[in-house]
């Protein structure tokens, strides 16, 4: 949406989640598996995916990647290149601000330690979804 010229902000973020929800829900209704990689820092955001699952009569599984090592988190953030120039990468201050505003989880989720190697994280996630 930002690439199409929409202004950055809460309303655009909600609209983006809703656009992805519609696509996810359509695929769930077709019996396909959907993986959404999103911050989900509020219950409103999480409920977006719960609504998609409910509409498709499909269970939703949340996997929370957690990285408590601040130095490693900063290193990964500063080394990250998603190739989405219209988005840009968040600053450390922006990440900290979102962390401070992060709403507690209501309902089940699985937490995975992201300080592990990529292979270990992938193995853990696959174990959870099987």
Residue ranges and their predicted role:
Residues 124-130:
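C-terminal alpha-helix
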Residues 1-30:
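Conserved substrate/cofactor phosphate-moiety recognition/catalytic segment
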Residues 37-45:
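Acidic, metal-coordinating catalytic cores used for nucleic-acid/nucleotide bond scission
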Residues 44-60:
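Short, electropositive alpha-helical surface patch
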Residues 79-124:
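Small-molecule kinase domains that catalyze NTP-dependent phosphoryl transfer to phosphate-bearing small molecules
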Residues 56-77, 112:
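Conserved phosphate-donor/acceptor-positioning beta-strand/loop module used by diverse small-molecule
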Residues 33-35:
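Residue-level preference for the first positions of well-ordered beta-strands
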Residues 25-29, 53-58, 102-104:
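Conserved catalytic network of the ASCE P-loop NTPase/AAA+ motor domain
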């Amino acid at each position: 949406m930002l690439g199409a010229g929409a202004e950055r902000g809460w309303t655009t973020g909600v609209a983006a989640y809703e656009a992805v929800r519609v696509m996810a829900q359509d695929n769930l209704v077709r019996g396909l598996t959907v993986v959404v990689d999103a911050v989900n820092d509020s219950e409103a955001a999480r409920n977006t995916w719960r609504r998609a699952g409910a509409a498709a009569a499909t269970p939703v599984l949340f996997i929370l990647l957690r990285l408590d090592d601040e130095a490693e988190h900063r290193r990964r953030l500063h080394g990250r290149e998603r190739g989405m120039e219209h988005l840009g990468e968040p600053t450390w201050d922006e990440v900290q601000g979102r962390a401070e505003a992060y709403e507690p989880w209501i309902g089940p989720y699985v937490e995975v330690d992201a300080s592990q190697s990529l292979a270990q994280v992938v193995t853990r996630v696959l174990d959870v979804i099987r």
